[in-house]
Amino acid sequence: VRDRQRSKVYAWEGSFIPDFHKNNLSEDNCVKMFDQLQKGFNSSDDRNMKLSLRFINGHGRCWHSPSRREIVLRFNWGLSRQVLLHEYAHALTDGKYESHGGEFVANYSVLLHLFHPKHPSFRELAQSLRDANVDWSDFKSSLAWKVFRRRKIKIAEAA
């Protein structure tokens, strides 16, 4: 599947989230946040996503690997809520759709709304996506919303 809006999504992140590529969590806090996301997702008997978190050195990209069922973050720039939430949104989208398509953007936006310290509103997210010419699916139809909207996971305690 062609990833037609990848560069648009990256540009949007860079403008919407100040210091996107700046570390703001420790490795331990990334693990705690990841564990809370996993606990929230797997809290229902009908959902079981086996996923691990790995850290590596280097200046390349961070990624989600569906085949290995892991999220990989870089020590030098990937230790932040926004990068972890970006990669977790890929895991929720699970390769069924375009990598940075509407489903991914909706999942990522909901995760930012719920778990980023600034808690951007859906209105703010939609306006910024519109301004960046990024397509998205309905936030409240996303898997992230269905799973996490009523979950009181303690991500704030992770950081």
Where are these regions (language model features)?
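Active-site-proximal or metal-binding-adjacent scaffold patches in catalytic folds
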Residues: V1-Q82, A91-A159
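Walker B catalytic acidic pair
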Residues: E87
